[in-house]
A protein has these predicted regions:
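Thiamine diphosphate
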Residues: 1-139
Length: 139
């Protein structure tokens, strides 16, 4: 839609795996997008629901050492992959990512698997009037 604009995709390892084959499309068309993969080794939203509503009983929401090496996978498509394992590595990795204007760059950023994201809509109805705004606050 905007070929002259910088495109940054912020995603998680669950969602990126649903369309990881598009790395081939990006190579074919020379699309220099930046992908920031927030990797918590889980289907984050599902795991968070299970933590909050089912006492932390996790069913089919964690990967338990079964994820691919996203850097190697990205590089196998001919793109640039960067692994960020520590918070103090993030700023320099982001600067490198943005500086590579003509390359697709995949930042695989490890995040705490126990960190939750808010606000969070509450199942089963998911109404905007029924959400968690913090671990202990539901509105």
């Amino acid at each position: 839609a905007y070929p002259d604009e910088e495109v940054i995709c912020i995603t998680g390892e669950g969602s990126i795996q649903m369309c990881i084959q598009e790395l081939s499309t990006c190579l074919q068309y020379g699309l220099p997008i930046k992908i920031i993969n927030l990797n918590n080794a889980a289907l984050g939203m599902v795991k968070q629901w299970q933590d909050m509503q089912y006492g932390g009983r996790h069913s089919s929401s964690t990967y338990e050492n079964s994820l691919p090496d996203f850097v190697a996978l990205t590089e196998s498509y001919g793109h640039v992959g960067i692994k960020v394992s520590k918070f103090d590595e993030l700023e320099s990795a982001m600067k490198e990512c943005i500086s590579l204007k003509d390359k697709l760059v995949f930042l695989d950023v490890d995040v705490d698997p126990n960190e939750h994201v808010y606000p969070m809509l509450v199942a089963p109805n998911g109404s905007m009037k029924d959400m968690w705004i913090s671990k202990n606050t539901k509105v």
